Amino acid sequence: MKTSTFAPFAKPLYVMVKPVGAVCNLACDYCYYLEKANLYKDNLKHVMSDELLEKFIDEYINSQTMPQVLFTWHGGETLMRPLSFYKKAMELQKKYARGRTIDNCIQTNGTMLTDEWCEFFRENNWLVGVSIDGPQEFHDEYRKNKMGKPSFVKVMQGINLLKKHGVEWNAMAVINDFNADYPLDFYRFFKEIGCQYIQFAPIVERILSHEDGRHLASLAENKAGTLADFSITPEQWGNFLCALFDEWVKEDVGKYYVQIFDSTLANWMGEQPGICTMAKTCGHAGVMEFNGDVYSCDHFVFPEYKLGNIYSKTLVEMMHSERQHNFGNMKYQSLPTQCKECEFLFACNGECPKNRFSQTAEGEPGLNYLCKGHYQFFKHVAPYMDFMKNELMNQRPPANIMEALKNGDLKIEY
């Protein structure tokens, strides 16, 4: 359903939790979060206290307007907190549930998974997201531990444990300069390891040194900055998505779920895309650090985007503040004319504001760095999306497109 006005309490309040802040057992070259530890140099331990855990769980559940409540545990590396921490969290969730249904999902690099962890996740129906960048030669390029040792073998051991215990899991893969030219190797790898739900995230960062030791630029810092070497190019991103889509649409619709394809079809239907990057507005997904500091978004953990602390302001006050509403609405309002006149604005919505540091041909600021790649993708998939939209509108499965392509019933002209 389309909404023309911003209705803050129509959506569940959502805040991801960082129980260990930026602490991690890996040191991935492209990680945007490791350096956030520099924001908390005065804290000896970047560990969430039991007191804060209880305060957050009580307030988070109490602030919900829906019967289902989703907790998302994020890092850093979440499993660097002991299992007892998450057992304590579940006890507190039950204590404060007040009749609501509680769900949990957790993101991990997979290297610390054990039988005990997996038994806990299975018994309590936790969804586990695993960060893995495809086959070993691609994954190990950037995802190494602090000693410079590769992590792929340990990640796969963790995935095999999840499968052994029947834990529901999905994969999140970062697409970078090194792996972007091999989309089919990537995609087929995930199918081979039995992963049905896949998220591909393009990495784009600018280097800009700060006095506190941080080296990544925020959107608010309009200084030029230097594009990080690991960043994907717009052309690589467009080619990656198109090649991957061509195989998926012929063989795997309804069998394997690629987040950006699902979200694109949702936007084609005029429905909510399910991810903030492709929505018209954002700002509904905040993040809370280990000490209770709340920020506008996981990709905006910078001093200028800090909303406050849970000890001095409530989650509702912060997440439904005028400041946060403006942050979310600016996703659309700050778009340059080129975007607002684009035929694919409805599908793209300017993607993530953090990547909007380029200029249009007319010199207007605010263009997404990946614009060319997104446009290439949407132009390429448009006839397929039109077909699948028509199937859904007529209460038929979009997977019918595979048979139509096989039989030559769907002629694609560009």
Whereabouts are the PLM-identified features?
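Radical SAM enzyme [4Fe-4S]-AdoMet core and its adjacent flexible, acidic
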Residues: N145-V153, N160, K164-T277, T281, ...
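Flexible, acidic/Gly-rich N-terminal and inter-domain linker regions that tether
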Residues: M1-Y14, L26-Y30, E59, K411-Y414
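Canonical Radical SAM [4Fe-4S] cluster-binding loop centered on the CxxxCxxC motif
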Residues: F9-E51
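Cysteine-centered iron-sulfur cluster-binding motifs in ferredoxin-type domains/subunits
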Residues: V20-A27, E77-M80, C282, C339-E341, ...
